[in-house]
């Protein structure tokens, strides 16, 4: 499929309800084996606390720029206070039901040389708690939100999933569930379930092949009155299933996998935020797949930011060079500037590419680190040059220009001048070729206003597209 459309995540407000926990990390080097037992000795040099479980889902949403509200159950202890502090710093709204006498669920991981050596769980599940106060808190927050995520780790917070799903359906809010266990009946009526393959097989039995997965998944969708199911399949990617519609399979995108901790949280958070922001299901799934590829390349419970996701979507479209839309170009420029690179901008019709163009573009490229070449659209050229032009249509001109070594990015514009594009890009250097003075270059005042440079370069004498066209017509 084509690159997914990224909606405005800032417009999304999502409610997350489920099992919250604190992910604690002890980091340190290890260089010897304990004399007491055949285990490595880790000298702890760094302590780190991160929100986990449903709290990590909410944190992922906040990192994307969305507004997240979180309903969960905790103890009345230091771990709960740390969770509230970390989440408040990310502007996540916390609505915790605090229980006396029980600890906040905490998972301690010992990390050395970027490897997890040991995990210790500190928990007593909240299964004996009255679910009514939790449901009431969900009901209060639901009226302000565009999607509900149920993040189920089977720790007791989601004791009444049918009731919560009914509340959401009554409010017309889609419900996304990250399921747990061998029985998906409590999630009946949800909009979308996101089991991993192991969780899926625990319910439907061993999957023999692709067709078996599709058949069993669609049957489960009908049995549970779901709209869709997304089965995440580790290195095999993910598969979206809907009753009566063709399956959509997306291959895994991760180049390196360091840690799958929290990857499911990332998937469901991107799905929910995308749908709440108005994205189509196919786009939401594609974005979630790309985000999963980013997060598994990080160590520990991690989040994916909106700029990271935009850059990854941009990279999905190619090698980071060549013909781009304006939106793709702005992302590429943002990435280049983050590396300290200077952006050079030039523009023109480039109807018939000749030696003068090649020499000019090579010189222009040397004025900085990256060269943006803005090309007049066909209608723009007709207005400027007359009804007989262009000789070559836009797509062909851009393809040839993108193949030149000096050119990093090629983008089209349909206006008579490139000023709107200049205002979006804000290049470090504006370059124009020909017999101009700096004051005659379109956009010079704007570029100088923020400290940019404006330069005029020479074309090779006696070579121009107009002269070439005239010679061809004379011979005809």
From Swiss-Prot:
<protein>
    <recommendedName>
        <fullName>Bifunctional protein HldE</fullName>
        <ecNumber>2.7.1.167</ecNumber>
        <ecNumber>2.7.7.70</ecNumber>
    </recommendedName>
</protein>
<feature type="binding site">
    <location>
        <begin position="196"/>
        <end position="199"/>
    </location>
    <ligand>
        <name>ATP</name>
    </ligand>
</feature>
<comment type="function">
    <text>Catalyzes the ADP transfer from ATP to D-glycero-beta-D-manno-heptose 1-phosphate, yielding ADP-D-glycero-beta-D-manno-heptose.</text>
</comment>
<dbReference type="Pfam" id="PF01467">
    <property type="entry name" value="CTP_transf_like"/>
</dbReference>
<keyword id="KW-0547">Nucleotide-binding</keyword>
<dbReference type="InterPro" id="IPR002173">
    <property type="entry name" value="Carboh/pur_kinase_PfkB_CS"/>
</dbReference>
<dbReference type="GO" id="GO:0097171">
    <property type="term" value="P:ADP-L-glycero-beta-D-manno-heptose biosynthetic process"/>
</dbReference>
<dbReference type="GO" id="GO:0033785">
    <property type="term" value="F:heptose 7-phosphate kinase activity"/>
</dbReference>
<dbReference type="GO" id="GO:0005524">
    <property type="term" value="F:ATP binding"/>
</dbReference>
<dbReference type="InterPro" id="IPR029056">
    <property type="entry name" value="Ribokinase-like"/>
</dbReference>
<dbReference type="GO" id="GO:0033786">
    <property type="term" value="F:heptose-1-phosphate adenylyltransferase activity"/>
</dbReference>
<feature type="region of interest" description="Ribokinase">
    <location>
        <begin position="1"/>
        <end position="320"/>
    </location>
</feature>
<keyword id="KW-0119">Carbohydrate metabolism</keyword>
<comment type="pathway">
    <text>Nucleotide-sugar biosynthesis; ADP-L-glycero-beta-D-manno-heptose biosynthesis; ADP-L-glycero-beta-D-manno-heptose from D-glycero-beta-D-manno-heptose 7-phosphate: step 1/4.</text>
</comment>
<feature type="region of interest" description="Cytidylyltransferase">
    <location>
        <begin position="345"/>
        <end position="476"/>
    </location>
</feature>
<dbReference type="InterPro" id="IPR011914">
    <property type="entry name" value="RfaE_dom_II"/>
</dbReference>
<keyword id="KW-0067">ATP-binding</keyword>
<dbReference type="InterPro" id="IPR011611">
    <property type="entry name" value="PfkB_dom"/>
</dbReference>
<keyword id="KW-0418">Kinase</keyword>
<keyword id="KW-0511">Multifunctional enzyme</keyword>
<comment type="similarity">
    <text>In the C-terminal section; belongs to the cytidylyltransferase family.</text>
</comment>
<feature type="active site">
    <location>
        <position position="265"/>
    </location>
</feature>
<dbReference type="InterPro" id="IPR014729">
    <property type="entry name" value="Rossmann-like_a/b/a_fold"/>
</dbReference>
<dbReference type="InterPro" id="IPR011913">
    <property type="entry name" value="RfaE_dom_I"/>
</dbReference>
<dbReference type="InterPro" id="IPR004821">
    <property type="entry name" value="Cyt_trans-like"/>
</dbReference>
<dbReference type="GO" id="GO:0016773">
    <property type="term" value="F:phosphotransferase activity, alcohol group as acceptor"/>
</dbReference>
<comment type="similarity">
    <text>In the N-terminal section; belongs to the carbohydrate kinase PfkB family.</text>
</comment>
<comment type="subunit">
    <text>Homodimer.</text>
</comment>
<keyword id="KW-0548">Nucleotidyltransferase</keyword>
<comment type="pathway">
    <text>Nucleotide-sugar biosynthesis; ADP-L-glycero-beta-D-manno-heptose biosynthesis; ADP-L-glycero-beta-D-manno-heptose from D-glycero-beta-D-manno-heptose 7-phosphate: step 3/4.</text>
</comment>
<dbReference type="InterPro" id="IPR023030">
    <property type="entry name" value="Bifunc_HldE"/>
</dbReference>
<dbReference type="Pfam" id="PF00294">
    <property type="entry name" value="PfkB"/>
</dbReference>
<keyword id="KW-0808">Transferase</keyword>
<dbReference type="GO" id="GO:0005829">
    <property type="term" value="C:cytosol"/>
</dbReference>
């Amino acid at each position: 499929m084509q690159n997914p459309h990224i909606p405005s995540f800032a417009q999304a407000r999502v409610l997350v309800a489920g099992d919250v926990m604190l992910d604690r990390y002890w980091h340190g080097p290890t260089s010897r084996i304990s004399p007491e037992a055949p285990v490595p000795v880790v000298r702890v040099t760094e302590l780190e606390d991160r929100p986990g479980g449903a709290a990590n889902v909410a944190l992922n949403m906040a990192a994307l720029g969305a507004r997240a509200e979180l309903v969960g159950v905790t103890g009345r202890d230091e771990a709960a206070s740390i969770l509230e502090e970390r989440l408040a710093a990310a502007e996540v709204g916390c609505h915790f039901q605090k229980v006396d006498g029980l600890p906040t669920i905490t998972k301690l991981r010992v990390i050395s040389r970027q490897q997890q050596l040991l995990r210790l769980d500190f928990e007593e599940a909240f299964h004996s708690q009255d679910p009514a106060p939790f449901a009431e808190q969900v009901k209060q927050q639901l009226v302000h939100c565009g999607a509900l995520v149920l993040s189920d780790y089977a720790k007791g917070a989601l004791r009444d999933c049918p009731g919560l799903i009914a509340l959401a359906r009554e409010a017309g809010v889609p419900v996304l569930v990250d399921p747990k266990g061998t029985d998906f009946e409590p999630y009946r009526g949800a909009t979308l379930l996101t089991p991993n393959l192991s969780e899926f097989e625990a319910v439907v039995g061993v999957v023999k092949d692709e067709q078996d997965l599709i058949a069993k998944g669609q049957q489960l969708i009908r049995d549970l009155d779901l709209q869709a199911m997304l089965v995440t399949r580790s290195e095999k990617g993910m598969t979206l299933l809907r009753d009566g519609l063709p399956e959509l399979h997306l291959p895994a995108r991760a180049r390196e996998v360091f840690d799958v901790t929290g990857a499911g949280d990332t998937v469901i958070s991107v799905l929910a935020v995308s749908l709440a922001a108005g994205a189509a299901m196919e786009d939401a799934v594609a974005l979630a797949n790309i985000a999963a590829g980013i997060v598994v390349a990080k160590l520990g419970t991690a989040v994916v930011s909106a700029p990271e996701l935009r850059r990854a979507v941009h990279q999905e479209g190619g090698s980071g060079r060549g013909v781009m839309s304006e939106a793709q170009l702005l992302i590429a420029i943002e990435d280049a500037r983050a590396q300290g690179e200077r952006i050079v901008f030039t523009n023109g019709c480039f109807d018939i590419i000749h030696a003068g163009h090649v020499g000019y573009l090579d010189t222009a490229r040397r004025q900085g680190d990256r060269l943006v070449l803005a090309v007049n659209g066909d209608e723009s050229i007709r207005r400027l040059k007359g009804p007989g032009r262009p000789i070559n249509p836009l797509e062909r001109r851009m393809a040839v220009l993108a193949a030149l070594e000096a050119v990093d990015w090629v983008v089209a514009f349909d206006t008579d001048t490139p000023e709107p594009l200049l205002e979006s890009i804000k290049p470090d250097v504006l370059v124009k070729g020909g017999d101009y003075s700096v004051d005659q270059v379109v956009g010079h005042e704007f570029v100088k206003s923020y400290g940019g440079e404006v330069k005029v370069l020479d074309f090779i004498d006696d070579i121009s597209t107009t002269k070439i066209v005239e010679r061809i017509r004379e011979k005809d």
